[in-house]
Every structure is written in structure tokens, then in C-alpha cells.
Amino acid sequence: MGVPALFRWLSRKYPKIISPVVEEEDHEIGGAKYENPNPNGEIDNLYLDMNGIVHPCSHPEHKKPPETEDEMFLDIFKYTDRVLMMARPRKVLMIAVDGVAPRAKMNQQRARRFRAAKDAELKAKQLEIEVQERELRGEIINDAIKGKKQWDSNAITPGTPFMDRLAEALRYWVAYKLSSDPGWANLQVIISDATVPGEGEHKLMSFIRSQRSDPQYDPNTKHCIYGLDADLIFLGLATHEPHFRVLREDVFASQDKKFTIKDQIADANSNGDTVAKEDKKPFLWLHVNVLREYLQVELFTPRMSFPFELERAIDDWVFLCFFAGNDFLPHLPSLDVRDNGIDTLVQCWKRSLPILKDYVTCDGKLNLKSVEVLMSNLAYKESEIFKNKHAAEQRREENNKRRKLAQEQERALKRVYSSQVSKGKDKAPLTADVNMPLMDTSGQNVEGYANLTNSDIVQNRAILTKANLANSDAAAELKKLIDSKKTQVTVVQDQIATDSSANSETTTSESELEEIQSDNSLKRKLEPEEDKQTQSDDIKLWEPGYNKRYYEAKFHCQSDEEIEQTKRDVVRHYVEGIAWVALYYYQGCPSWNWYFPYHYAPFAADFTNLEELFPEGVKFKLGEPFRPFEQLMSVLPAASGHTLPQVFRDLMSNPDSEIIDFYPEEFEIDMNGKKMSWQGIPLLPFIDEKRLLDAVQKKYELLTPDEKSRNTNKEAELFISPANKNFSKFSEKLYKENENEVTFKYAKSGLSGKIFKLGTFNPEGVFNFPLNEGYMPNVNNSDYFQAIYHFPKTKTGKSMILNGHIAPLPALTTADKNDLLYQLDKFNNRRNGGRFNSTLDNSDYINKGPAGKELYKTYSMRRGGYRSYLQYLTNGHHPDHQSQNSQYLSYGQQKPYGGQGSYNQQGYYNQQGRYNQQGNNYNQQGRYSQQSQYNQYRSNTQRFNNNQNYNQSSNNSRSGYLPPRPQR
């Protein structure tokens, strides 16, 4: 899920969650090695969301794209190896590629792929225009660039030949690394390719939940997930794992360095020698444990009728973020991450919580009454939010107008000054492009050129340029071409980088062609703003009556009665949607067939009487996932039909096809008040599942064996090296004793599950290098092991941290908490040292795990459970941590902690009514024990001491008590 601007917003509001990755440079052979200690701290399990690697490697934005698919695969190998060298997992590596998605996700996939096809078409037309413009100027363009077709990124969809080849390439690369890299000797690699249903990141989460269900699971496992989607942060929180990091590119580090059409033409003309080598993008860590600390401070709410539990509060916070944007539902009209919509919802949540009897969510299930109270609080502020957004937009537009006017005035002054200075005989020209030498057709300087004034040059440039052309009508033909296509180019102005934008600053004295370019560039800049103003004026959300106007404009309602009926239906489906998303994040996909059947969301004020809509709660039927070709037919436009088997293409392009209406060539994009075209809403028809499946399944008998194989949903595979502890057991039982399956537990290697014999794997065979380009050696199958892998049976996930965890050391100081509570220097963390100023002090940030690497040696892969580990400590082992023994013992004696199926409450009342925070226990007299680490964990909202009880603090809170505002 990509929630726009979420990562930037989080990193600004919670600055300490981000730190740069320390990357060792391999300057010489034998330099950086995988088996060496990790300078970023050790990691047990690494999870790769491979689509975050495949996309930038196959169609990069900042460098020349690969010419062939084999080049893409080699780039993927190189990129993945770089990621692994940064993370260096020691136990498990899971590689997950997006498989067939739930129906709810296909709406967004369909919109993205239709837009991608349209953008590719417009970019090809723009390249054609650019080439002809340059030829009219006398440039010689390499024939290789003319009519060149760009690689179709829509091929990165399950079921295409590209994805089949990608899976085979990944299997080879893993086998090669296991057989040749000493650092991979004990690594267990799971590959879940595009034939395994499910989105990549959610397949990773399913794996984590399955491992947590194993009684031998180590609750101090250090997890890391790589990917570009912002929802990985939510997924990390949803695991309730205390040691979790997200690894990602710093996408904002070089966002202005685009590989433009100018670069593309220059590269073709020079055979690839002129384009500068791409600088490596830096990477970032996002520390989920630090985000948990921030949320503990921000979400604490006094005066509640039930105990505050951090894990439940975090689940509610994740749920609140769904309303601001997700891949399955449109966000509420009043909420946007860029406008601090999440902060608005958190305020509503904190106001609602004291009057509720429970949290809004529990293990991914919704309390509809709590949802209704939450929405009523938001509805109370909704009209004010629209007014404030409109006022802010007006101020922004006025500021932009003033800034543009100032820039125009400055440019005018420069032109006047430049013209005056250029007339002087002893002065160098300030504008070299205006005083450029003029050549005749033989390449000689134009006679009398040195005597021409600046004005003469400008007036005669167009005539002299046209004289260089053999065809006197070429300029007129080009003008007609541009006039006919310029309106199409404007649609994707914000996605396609061009060089003609510089011409928008030219003067009216320049040539006719340059005036056309300037006009085009100006329209590309102004039209989205005009669309935005038009869309805003249609509904006028800041004026009374916006609710009725909204349903009339967006849902085409004709009467008040129809509005009410539509409103209830939209709310019903939207509540189903947020219930579906919550379960999807916490328990796995609740239904493969459910989807939201509207393009727009309701208002917060429309969420009324929810229990009447769902008297028995929200229910789902699991259903079955689509087959790969069925998803391709659901999400691809006709322009990408070449990725499908030939038998299906006629269904997408033949006017007589029974489902031709699913594949419009032209479709409306509703900007919906947004500025950038990618933010617009493509108004595509929704797929009728029954009609689609009936049409597609009629063609199955015409498929070739290879195509039938690509259209089959399959299972994950496990790879290990001969050095793995389970290698001998697996090989003997599956291939010598011919057992059907082998079950293995977590304690031996840090992984549990079942394996089955893979029919295509021969232990005595050879894995040949599958690419035609590049060279890598063939791999003997005896140097690695491969089998079908099943996750262990997963129990219902619980919103809790498992017993036996060792909490990370706190990263936030009192000043950090005050900054968050009082919003000091909000979103200005680039001051005083730049982006990472808050994490540069080593004393302020722990970058080697919760308490240093040594803490895990005695605890990792423990036998006998947590009680055995406590006994180990009490016998005098590990003297460096004797000061912590009493804390561990008091933790183990706590009565409220149950088994791993119960909630690990973050706080509860004792019999004397005193509050117990962060698991710090009381003795029998209700007083703090001497071993309590209370002072280490206290927050700014709870100022307790040994003689002050919780009720006194609550009374202070009721009277408006807050700690004194810090002086800055």
C-alpha cells in the first residue's frame, strides 16, 4: 500500500525513527564480507518485498533503463545483493513477489495500469515531437531512438512471461549464493514468487504470524523488512514485535535527477557514452521500536474507564491511518496526510476514548459503536476542516502569484540590463544563447555577423534557421504536428520530464516555433491548476450544502431520497471496507472476492446508526483467489495485451467481445481538487466478476502446457545450504526414505514449518544459468537443497508482545517527549544539523539492537523457555547483566501475565488503585519495588513518585493539569 506523503510526514513528526544506513564500501577484493559483523547491528530475519526492487531495476527514473530483460535480472541480482550486505540476516531470508491480489486491491491495480499505458503512449508521442523539433534545428538524431518502443512496466503482473522468468532467475541466484557465499552458510531462504497468491508484503506478514504461533518462537527475534510502500510501517507495528526495522531507499535524496528525454536522445547519439554514471541512492532505517515510544507518549489518554494498553492503542492508531489513505478504499474527503489528517483523527480518538468502554479495535476486529463515536467527533469538525483547507489553499495561491510576479519582474530587469550591456563593444555578452554564432549551410559564419546587434540577431534567427532546412515547409508541418498533439501531452505533465519547459521563459521576439513551445509549456503548468479550481468550484466544500452537492456531482443522485439511499449504501460498503482492511493487516485476507464498488468515500457525518446496518457484525466469506490470467484480464488495458496468451487478446480488442466494455481506450480522470495528474481518480468501469470469468474460462482449453503452468497458483519454496543443521535430515527423509513430508521445529534453526518433495528438483542434477546475457557459473544441485515449504499452522493473532521479550532501551529523551507533546519546532527538524540531526549523537541512539549485541548470546535459541533463562541468570551467569537480574525476576513473578494466547497488558490497577506502567510491579503493600525501572520509562503525562498514586494524577488531569510547558 502506498499512502502518499506518509513516510515524509512520519519522519518529520517523529524524527528519531529515521537513521541513515552505514554501508561498507567494497573497494578491494576481500573488503566488505557478508560474514563480518554488521555495522548497523545484527539482524535475524530479513524480508524482501521484491516489487520494491523489480520496479526501480526494470524502469529506473534516474538512469538509462536496461535494454533487455536479462539486463534487468542482472541489475536485480546486484541490487538485492547490496540490500543483503546492508542487513546481513543470520537466520532467515524471505523473498516475496506480488502474486494474485485480493479483489479489493485489483481496483487500484487496474487504475494504475491503465494510467501507465496511457502515460507510455503520451511519452512516445512527446519523444516523436522532440526528435522532429531537433531535426528541424539541424541536429542529426540516431535512428535507434526513432520509433523506439519502451518496455511495458505492466509486465510486472502475475502470470506474464516476465514474472515466470523472474522467478527462475531468483531461484538460480539463491542457489548460487548458498553454494558459493560463506556468509550464507546458515541462512534459510524462502521464495514466494508470483505464482503464490497474495501481495508480497502480506505474504511476509503471514509468515511472521505463523512463526509467532510456534511455542518455541524467540520473542527477541530481530526483524527487518525491505520495501518502498509506506504501509510496511503499519505492518511492522501490527506484528507487535519489539525488535523491528524497515529498510528503504531515501527516495527524496535525488528526486530531481531524472533521466529525461534529452538524456535519452543524447545517450542514443553517443552510443551510451555521455550519460553520467548514476550515484548510489542512500538507504534509511526506520526503527519501529522508536515509533512505538513516540506513540506511547502521544496516545496516552487519562480519565479512561478502562486501563491504558499500549498495544491496543497502537492498533487503534494504525486503524485511524486507514481513513487517511490505503490501497483498498478512497480516503475520507476531510482527511489528507499532507494536511495533518492523522493528527486530526488522533485528537478525535482521544476525545472519544474516555466515554467508550473499550478500544475501537481488538485483534483486527471493529467495535462498530466505537467507530460511530469516533466518526461523530470527526463530523463535528468536518465543515471547519473544509473551511480551513480552502483558506490555506487561497493563501498558497496568493503566495504563488506574488512569487511568480516577482520572478517575472526579475527576469524582465535582467533582459533589459543584458541588452544594454551586450551593446557595449568591450563587454562580454551575458546571454550566450541570444548571441550565438550564425552559420550558413556550408558551416561558415554568416557574413556581417560580427556587426549584428542583439536585436538584429533575434529578428533574423528564425529566417537563418529555416534557411538551413532543405524543405521550406518543414517548420509549418512541425507546427501542425505540435498543435494536434499538445493537448494530449498536457495530461501527464507532472510525470514526464521535458526540456521544453525552459522555453516558457522566452520573449515574444523569438521565433514562431519557440513561441509554440513556450505556449505548450505554459499550458502544461497552468492546466492542472485550472482543473483543480474547476473541481473545487463544482462542490464548494467550504460552503453550506456541500453534502448534497457532493452526492449530486460524484454519485449522480437526482433527488433527496436517492441521496439518502446512496449515502447509506456507500457507508455500508465503506464500513465493510475498513473492517476488511483491519482484518487483512492483523489476521490475513478475510475475503478474496470483496471490493469497494465506488470511486469516492462518504463524509464522516454519514457514519450513523452503524449497528442497524450490521446487526450481527461485519461478516465475510473467504472465497478463492483468481488465477493469474484472470487477474491479468481484470487489471490490464488492451495496450498491454501482448503480455497475455494470444487466445485472450481478442477479448480486449475486438468490438464484438462480450467484455469489451471493461477495456476503454479513453477514460475520464477526475482531478477531485488535486493538482498533480497522478492524484486524479481514473473513472474506470468496475469489473463484473461473473462476466469476466465466464469469458476467460472458455479459452482455457486452448492454452499451451507452458501457459497452463503459468496460470496455476503454486506454493512457496525453501532453500538451504549443506552447512544448515537440517540439511542431512531433509535430504535423507525426502529423497532417500521417500517420506511425503517433514515437519521441523523452531528451536533447531530459527525456522519452523513443513516441507514436501519438489518434483522438479533432482539432488544429482545441475541448475544451469538461465540468462542469455552476462555470465555466472552453473550450480550443482548437491550444493544446496530445495523443497516446497508450508508455514506452520497459524493461530488467531493477538495484539500483544509475547512473554519473555527484552524491551529495547529507550531512545527518546525528556526533550524529545516534550517536543512531541507540545509540538515544538513541528516539522522543522531540518534545522540545526539537517535531516538526521536527532540521531547523530551516539549516546542518544542505540544502533546495535535493544541493549547491545551481547545481550542476545545467552538468550538466543534458548532451551526450556523463559523460566529456564531466568534460572540461568540467577545461577550467576552473564555478570555484565547482573544489575538487570532483579528486574527479570520481578517480571517473571508478575501474576497478570498469562500464556502466549493472552494479552500482555501494558498497564493495570492494583488493589490499592495505584497505576502500574510498563510492567513495573508493586510489592504486597502496593508500593514500588526497589528493582522497579519506573523512572526509566515514565512519560511526560504521568508524573508519579513513590508517594503519589494514580488517582491523584487522574484528579489533576480532570482539572486540566499538564506538566509545565518547557522553555525553548
Curated annotation (Swiss-Prot):
<comment type="similarity">
    <text>Belongs to the 5'-3' exonuclease family. XRN2/RAT1 subfamily.</text>
</comment>
<dbReference type="GO" id="GO:0000150">
    <property type="term" value="F:DNA strand exchange activity"/>
</dbReference>
<dbReference type="GO" id="GO:0019843">
    <property type="term" value="F:rRNA binding"/>
</dbReference>
<keyword id="KW-0804">Transcription</keyword>
<feature type="region of interest" description="Disordered">
    <location>
        <begin position="498"/>
        <end position="538"/>
    </location>
</feature>
<dbReference type="GO" id="GO:0000398">
    <property type="term" value="P:mRNA splicing, via spliceosome"/>
</dbReference>
<dbReference type="InterPro" id="IPR004859">
    <property type="entry name" value="Xrn1_N"/>
</dbReference>
<dbReference type="InterPro" id="IPR027073">
    <property type="entry name" value="5_3_exoribonuclease"/>
</dbReference>
<dbReference type="GO" id="GO:0071028">
    <property type="term" value="P:nuclear mRNA surveillance"/>
</dbReference>
<dbReference type="Pfam" id="PF17846">
    <property type="entry name" value="XRN_M"/>
</dbReference>
<keyword id="KW-0540">Nuclease</keyword>
<dbReference type="GO" id="GO:0110103">
    <property type="term" value="C:RNA polymerase II termination complex"/>
</dbReference>
<dbReference type="GO" id="GO:0090730">
    <property type="term" value="C:Las1 complex"/>
</dbReference>
<dbReference type="Pfam" id="PF03159">
    <property type="entry name" value="XRN_N"/>
</dbReference>
<dbReference type="GO" id="GO:0003723">
    <property type="term" value="F:RNA binding"/>
</dbReference>
<dbReference type="GO" id="GO:0004534">
    <property type="term" value="F:5'-3' RNA exonuclease activity"/>
</dbReference>
<keyword id="KW-0806">Transcription termination</keyword>
<protein>
    <recommendedName>
        <fullName>5'-3' exoribonuclease 2</fullName>
        <ecNumber>3.1.13.-</ecNumber>
    </recommendedName>
</protein>
<feature type="region of interest" description="Disordered">
    <location>
        <begin position="873"/>
        <end position="968"/>
    </location>
</feature>
<feature type="coiled-coil region">
    <location>
        <begin position="113"/>
        <end position="140"/>
    </location>
</feature>
<dbReference type="InterPro" id="IPR017151">
    <property type="entry name" value="Xrn2/3/4"/>
</dbReference>
<keyword id="KW-0378">Hydrolase</keyword>
<keyword id="KW-0507">mRNA processing</keyword>
<feature type="compositionally biased region" description="Low complexity">
    <location>
        <begin position="498"/>
        <end position="510"/>
    </location>
</feature>
<feature type="compositionally biased region" description="Low complexity">
    <location>
        <begin position="902"/>
        <end position="959"/>
    </location>
</feature>
<dbReference type="GO" id="GO:0071035">
    <property type="term" value="P:nuclear polyadenylation-dependent rRNA catabolic process"/>
</dbReference>
<dbReference type="GO" id="GO:0043144">
    <property type="term" value="P:sno(s)RNA processing"/>
</dbReference>
<dbReference type="GO" id="GO:0008017">
    <property type="term" value="F:microtubule binding"/>
</dbReference>
<keyword id="KW-0805">Transcription regulation</keyword>
<dbReference type="GO" id="GO:0110155">
    <property type="term" value="P:NAD-cap decapping"/>
</dbReference>
<dbReference type="GO" id="GO:0030846">
    <property type="term" value="P:termination of RNA polymerase II transcription, poly(A)-coupled"/>
</dbReference>
<comment type="subunit">
    <text>Interacts with RAI1; the interaction is direct, stabilizes RAT1 protein structure and may stimulate its exoribonuclease activity. The interaction also stimulates RAI1 pyrophosphohydrolase activity, probably by recruiting it to mRNA substrates.</text>
</comment>
<comment type="function">
    <text>Possesses 5'-&gt;3' exoribonuclease activity. Required for the processing of nuclear mRNA and rRNA precursors. May promote the termination of transcription by RNA polymerase II. Essential for vegetative cell growth and chromosome segregation.</text>
</comment>
<feature type="coiled-coil region">
    <location>
        <begin position="387"/>
        <end position="416"/>
    </location>
</feature>
<dbReference type="GO" id="GO:1904595">
    <property type="term" value="P:positive regulation of termination of RNA polymerase II transcription"/>
</dbReference>
<dbReference type="GO" id="GO:0000448">
    <property type="term" value="P:cleavage in ITS2 between 5.8S rRNA and LSU-rRNA of tricistronic rRNA transcript (SSU-rRNA, 5.8S rRNA, LSU-rRNA)"/>
</dbReference>
<dbReference type="GO" id="GO:0030847">
    <property type="term" value="P:termination of RNA polymerase II transcription, exosome-dependent"/>
</dbReference>
<keyword id="KW-0175">Coiled coil</keyword>
<keyword id="KW-0269">Exonuclease</keyword>
<feature type="compositionally biased region" description="Polar residues">
    <location>
        <begin position="882"/>
        <end position="893"/>
    </location>
</feature>
<dbReference type="InterPro" id="IPR041412">
    <property type="entry name" value="Xrn1_helical"/>
</dbReference>
<dbReference type="GO" id="GO:0005634">
    <property type="term" value="C:nucleus"/>
</dbReference>
